[in-house]
């Protein structure tokens, strides 16, 4: 997926991180998994959104890419 395929909010933050105006997190996969886990665990959110977040987190965890 390319940044231009993402929503406006993602593109905005991408630009801010790239310009140095927003902090960069070197362990981005860990950050993503933690965020997806928080979404999946939040029972106030719709079930479909929680299931999608859980699926994405599980796929990241099982992938061979690791933060170093």
From Swiss-Prot:
The name this protein goes by in its record: UPF0253 protein VFMJ11_0680
**Matches recorded under InterPro entries:** UPF0253
The family note in this entry says: Belongs to the UPF0253 family.
Q: The organism sits in which domain of life?
A: Bacteria
